[in-house]
């Protein structure tokens, strides 16, 4: 089953942004997502991530915490504080796995947290669940606007 297409409306490909400054980590995540029918874009630092979000409009971001220019915590907070980007699902994928790091990630607004080294099966399951949630949320919002329009 191709995960992202099954989760997306009208069989549109889901869009995933991988934000990590470490080339081998990016290559590993791309390889793990090879069987997922999705479009992938790469960002190499925090500022690049914000720029790519504006252009690529991802459904999901796999976000490293320790990046140059802006940390993953800062990027996540900026995205979740902005109504235009707050609905983007964020999965922090990081070597930081202390309780304090997880708390900071949650405080910044992350939707989920995955510690490195990443297990392929776990990553795919989380990506699948997050994309399904994103698309269901989008559909609920579309229906809410439709019903509201009927009442006006």
Show which residues each predicted segment covers.
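Receiver (REC) domain active-site loop signature in two-component systems and cognate sites
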Residues: 67, 90
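Two-component/phosphorelay signaling modules centered on CheY-like receiver
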Residues: 23-44
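Active-site beta3 strand of CheY-like receiver
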Residues: 56-62
């Amino acid at each position: 089953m191709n995960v992202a297409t099954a989760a997306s409306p009208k069989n549109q490909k889901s869009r995933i942004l991988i934000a990590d400054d470490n080339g081998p980590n990016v290559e590993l995540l791309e390889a793990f997502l090879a069987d997922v029918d999705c479009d992938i874009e790469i960002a190499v630092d925090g500022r690049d991530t914000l720029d790519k979000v504006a252009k690529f409009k991802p459904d999901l971001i796999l976000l490293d915490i320790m990046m140059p220019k802006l940390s993953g915590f800062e990027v996540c907070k900026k995205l979740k504080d902005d109504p235009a980007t707050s609905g983007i699902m964020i999965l922090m994928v990081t070597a930081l796995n202390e309780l304090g790091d997880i708390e900071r990630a949650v405080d910044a607004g992350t939707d989920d947290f995955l510690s490195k080294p990443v297990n392929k099966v776990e990553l795919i399951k989380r990506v699948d669940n997050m994309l399904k949630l994103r698309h269901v949320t989008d559909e609920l919002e579309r229906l809410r606007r439709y019903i509201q329009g009927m009442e006006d």
